[in-house]
């Protein structure tokens, strides 16, 4: 009886070992051999200006061409030019690849134009210890802030508000 039990145990262990060996040696399925999804990272550091807008446009086009699964834009900006901000936002909204804008690292900001860029993304995220906001447009031709009358100020603010509303509603965000 003891000997029969011993033979059964030995047979079970041998069968299990052989099955494990065959499973390990078996070719992997297509799902396992697929490459990892491509995530393209772009840096939006410093003032928002035409060269940066062009860099973001080219990066998003490259991501689409390479069939990336996602574009991650890491942002730290005090803001910048309205035209460049608008270009970046249009590129993000038109991107066939989902875009995440992430304010990082600790201490970074997504202020002024950066705030609107953040809200235009498919996913807007912030690292702990970062800040955003202060998105009121200012009139500063040649980077020199100039006083403007109340009528022009209202026109500029209303235009910025309408633009913000257009894409926050598209993204399903509260306005």
PLM regions and their residue ranges:
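Soluble extramembrane regions of membrane proteins in the secretory/endomembrane system
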Residues: 26-175
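N-terminal secretory signal peptides that target proteins for export/translocation
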Residues: 1-6
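Hydrophobic alpha-helical context, especially transmembrane and signal-peptide helices
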Residues: 8-11, 37
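Bacterial N-terminal signal peptides
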Residues: 11-24
């Amino acid at each position: 009886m003891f000997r029969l039990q011993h033979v059964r145990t030995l047979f079970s262990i041998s069968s299990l070992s052989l099955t494990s060996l065959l499973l390990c040696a078996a070719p992997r399925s297509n799902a396992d051999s697929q490459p990892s999804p491509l995530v393209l990272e772009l840096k939006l550091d410093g003032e928002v200006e035409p060269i940066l807008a062009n860099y973001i446009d080219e990066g998003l086009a490259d991501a689409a061409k390479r069939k990336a699964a996602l574009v991650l834009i890491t942002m730290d900006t005090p803001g910048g030019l309205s035209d460049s901000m608008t270009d970046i936002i249009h590129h993000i909204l038109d991107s066939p690849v989902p875009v995440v804008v992430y304010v990082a690292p600790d201490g970074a900001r997504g202020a002024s134009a950066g705030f609107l860029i953040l809200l235009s993304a498919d996913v807007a995220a912030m690292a702990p210890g970062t800040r955003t906001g202060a998105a009121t447009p200012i009139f500063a031709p040649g980077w020199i802030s100039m006083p403007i009358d109340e009528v022009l100020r209202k026109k500029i603010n209303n235009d910025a508000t309408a633009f913000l509303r257009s894409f926050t509603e598209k993204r399903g965000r509260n306005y």
